[in-house]
């Protein structure tokens, strides 16, 4: 929204100023989208519903995002980017590979389960196969490659077995969302450590 020389803001105003909300409009849209996409479903959620949940008019929403796809893409990338950045750091360290693999698993589970909404469930949406989400898929592939590299360092597996164990470990980590959803009151840190222990057993490390 623009500001006149006299200090008056011009442009489309927010439909509702939600009391106690200090986030910027884009963050509020992402929060609203996360809730609606995971509770109602992506296809069943309209841009109008997202805007209203964020406390603004639908037309105002387009000042901040291009639409539902942009919101979904950013939400998906938020589940991968922190773990990918950490994986790159761990790959560069000289600690035992087994310890680094355990730490990546633990941290990744905390990212996936630490949020208020089950964003990992969005991975299964058919829309994610579209070109708009290529960046997310590339980041996810790079993260999986980091897992493979650490499993390879921590074990002496042949390529075929290495690929299988990597698939199983990666599947365990991404699948924990469903387990966590069945008991959301379980402490995430405890759950993350237990999952990392299980991942090492699966890898044979």
Segments predicted by a language model, with ranges:
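C-terminal peripheral helix-coil segments that are non-catalytic and often amphipathic
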Residues: 1-12, 144-157, 172, 178-205
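Helix-turn-helix
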Residues: 28, 32, 36-70, 74
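Amphipathic alpha-helical interaction segments
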Residues: 28, 99-107, 164-172, 190, ...
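Hydrophobic alpha-helical connector segments
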Residues: 74, 85-114
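Amphipathic alpha-helical packing segments from all-alpha helical-bundle domains
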Residues: 81-84, 130-156, 162-167, 190-193
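Amphipathic alpha-helical segments used for helix-helix packing
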Residues: 100-103, 109-134, 148, 178
């Amino acid at each position: 929204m623009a500001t006149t020389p006299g200090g008056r803001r011009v442009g489309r105003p927010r439909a509702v100023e939600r009391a106690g909300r200090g986030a910027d409009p884009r963050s509020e849209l992402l929060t609203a989208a996360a809730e609606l996409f995971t509770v109602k479903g992506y296809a069943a959620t309209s841009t109008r519903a997202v805007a209203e949940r964020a406390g603004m008019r639908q037309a105002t929403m387009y000042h901040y995002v291009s639409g539902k796809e942009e919101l979904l893409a950013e939400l998906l990338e938020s589940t991968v980017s922190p773990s990918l950045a950490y994986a790159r750091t761990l790959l560069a360290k000289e600690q035992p590979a087994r310890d680094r693999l355990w730490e990546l698993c633990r941290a990744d589970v905390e990212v996936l389960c630490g949020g208020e909404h089950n964003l990992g469930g969005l991975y299964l949406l058919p829309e994610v196969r579209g070109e708009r989400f290529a960046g997310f898929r590339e980041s996810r592939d790079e993260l999986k490659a980091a897992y493979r590299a650490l499993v390879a360092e921590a074990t002496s597996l042949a390529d075929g077995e290495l690929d299988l164990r990597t698939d199983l470990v990666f599947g365990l980590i991404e699948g924990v969302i469903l387990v966590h959803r069945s008991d959301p009151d379980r402490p995430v840190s405890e759950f993350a450590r237990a999952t990392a222990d299980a991942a090492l057993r699966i890898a044979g490390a």
